[in-house]
């Protein structure tokens, strides 16, 4: 395929046009008075949203050079969303500001590499100062406040705060569509996995069709149990304790299953068998998780263990197990807390190392099950369009809240970025590096400027007053008042603000140091065959 190539100023200018088109579309959503953007969908009704990354992903420009610029900014939004879960619009606004100011200086003859070094130094100083002025987030009210700011709904803030309180900060909180119009919270405490009983005759409550085991022993194995003789010595030992047994195995079939069912029906022995969750290597990892949670050992050839030789020492224990036809929930496992903490640390390190979104999601689920539960926020709305928009807002709020708990909070509404200007301005740099620092100083003002503009105020006036104010005091664009931002609940997670600035500076620097852009030339359309003269067509 033939290529189209542009150099120097032509290359940068074409990319910057794309940056501006995307940023101008996204930045109208910033702040409490931000507007919505309507996105046409190939099927169904249009999507109305104010979520920066969702809008950025939809933008595709006809001009290849402009499209490359737009895609780079879209990448900033996506990366910020992946790291912090929010702050995508702020990242887009910062990128545009750094690119715009940087391009002026490069065009005037400044060295792009020197500018880049200055930008990197200034951003590092800004990030350090953000961490210095951060306040830790703890307590239900503070968590609810962060979530309410991000979702623009106090009710959603309460749901997320309650969910995190119930399942822990590392717990899985999923967002699903409700069948009704009301949004509600449902929490499953304990470790849950999607495997139900192998026989309905194992239920203890015929009305609810569930089996509830109080203070059970738990046998965990990756083997298939077909012969009852394999586990008979172990069953006899458990029978002496007069406690129920949960069997988690690759499968239970052959003569083993009917024998267990028969003993259950006769009242000899209260036992429930379920298949092991997951597949392949993930199954082994999940069985190990269950073993650590319950204080048991996985009976597997990998450890040189055989079912025939298994003793009571390999069995796990828990306060309660509930099994229905589709799922199993283990509550209050008897595992050692330090062993569980070590397992959680291993899973967290695997999450950081993986590059696969799917693997990260599965690791997050395992982490949550070890940490103590799963919460489901069921979103209700009057129309499908409203439902989609609400789900996006709640996802943003959930990510922002987790980020706040992790690294703390700073004043919201772009105030924190203006608060760090003094520290960045104090940097002693020379030449083009000083120019790079000055570009960052100007860019740090841009989110406040845009929030003020969207709310109908003059940004320059707001910024000048903000620079004279104490740290923590800021402009509430929702009502035009000057307030203590944290006390009023206008806050941003440090992780969100930091990620937005770092990602914006990274991509903007790449654009400024670009000297050539290579794009595919559009292929000429194939000529269409001329229509045949009807008089030349044969008849029957």
Curated annotation (Swiss-Prot):
Primary localization: cytoplasm
Disulfide bonding pattern of the chain: none
Superkingdom of the organism of origin: Bacteria
Name used for this protein in its record: Chaperonin GroEL
Substrates-to-products reaction catalysed: ATP + H2O + a folded polypeptide = ADP + phosphate + an unfolded polypeptide
InterPro entries in alphabetical order: Chaperonin_Cpn60_CS, Cpn60/GroEL, Cpn60/GroEL/TCP-1, GroEL-like_apical_dom_sf, GROEL-like_equatorial_sf, TCP-1-like_intermed_sf
CC annotations in GO: cytoplasm
Subcellular location: Cytoplasm
């Amino acid at each position: 395929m033939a290529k189209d190539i542009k150099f120097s100023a032509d290359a940068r200018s074409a990319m910057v046009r794309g940056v501006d088109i995307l940023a101008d579309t996204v930045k109208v959503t910033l702040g409490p008075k931000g507007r919505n953007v309507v996105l046409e969908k190939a099927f169904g009704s249009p999507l109305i949203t104010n979520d920066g990354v969702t809008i950025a992903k939809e933008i595709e420009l006809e001009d290849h050079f402009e499209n490359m610029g737009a895609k780079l900014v879209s990448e900033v939004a996506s990366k910020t969303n992946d790291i912090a879960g929010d702050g995508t619009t702020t990242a887009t606004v910062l990128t545009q500001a750094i690119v715009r100011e940087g391009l002026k200086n490069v065009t005037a003859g400044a060295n792009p590499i020197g500018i880049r070094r200055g930008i990197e130094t200034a951003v590092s100083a800004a990030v350090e100062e953000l961490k210095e002025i951060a306040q830790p987030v703890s307590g239900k009210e503070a968590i609810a406040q962060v979530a309410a700011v991000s979702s623009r709904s106090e009710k959603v803030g309460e749901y997320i705060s309650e969910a995190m309180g119930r399942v822990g900060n590392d717990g899985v909180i999923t967002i699903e569509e409700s069948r009704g119009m009301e949004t509600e919270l449902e929490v499953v405490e304990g470790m849950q996995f999607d495997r139900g009983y192998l026989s309905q005759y194992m239920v203890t409550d015929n009305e609810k069709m569930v089996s509830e085991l109080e203070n059970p022993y738990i046998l965990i194995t990756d083997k298939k149990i077909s012969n009852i003789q394999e586990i008979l010595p172990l069953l006899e030992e458990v029978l002496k304790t007069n406690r129920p047994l949960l069997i988690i195995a690759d499968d239970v079939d052959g003569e083993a299953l009917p024998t267990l069912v028969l003993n259950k029906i006769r009242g000899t022995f209260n036992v429930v068998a379920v298949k092991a969750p997951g597949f392949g290597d993930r199954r082994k990892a999940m069985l190990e998780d269950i073993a650590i949670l319950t204080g048991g050992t996985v009976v597997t050839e990998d450890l040189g263990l055989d079912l025939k030789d298994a003793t009571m020492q390999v069995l796990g224990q828990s306060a309660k197990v509930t099994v229905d036809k589709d799922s199993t929930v283990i509550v209050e496992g008897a595992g050692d807390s330090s062993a569980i903490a070590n397992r959680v640390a291993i899973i967290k390190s695997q999450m950081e190392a993986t590059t696969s979104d799917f693997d990260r999601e599965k690791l997050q689920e395992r982490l949550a099950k070890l940490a103590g539960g799963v919460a489901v926020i069921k979103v209700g709305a009057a129309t499908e369009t409203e439902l989609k928009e609400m789900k996006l807002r709640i996802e943003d709020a959930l990510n922002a809240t987790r980020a706040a708990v992790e690294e703390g909070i700073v004043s919201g509404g772009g105030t924190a970025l203006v608060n760090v200007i003094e520290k960045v301005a104090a940097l002693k740099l020379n030449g083009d590096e000083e120019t790079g620092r000055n570009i960052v100083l100007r860019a740090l003002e841009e989110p406040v400027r845009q929030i003020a503009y969207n709310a109908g105020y003059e940004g320059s006036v707001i910024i000048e007053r903000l620079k004279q104010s104490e740290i923590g005091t800021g402009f509430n664009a929702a009502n035009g008042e000057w307030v203590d931002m944290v006390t009023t609940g206008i806050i941003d997670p440090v992780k969100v603000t930091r990620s937005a600035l770092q990602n914006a500076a990274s991509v903007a620097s790449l654009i400024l140091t670009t000297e050539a852009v290579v794009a595919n030339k559009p292929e000429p359309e194939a000529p269409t065959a001329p229509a045949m003269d009807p008089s030349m067509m044969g008849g029957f």
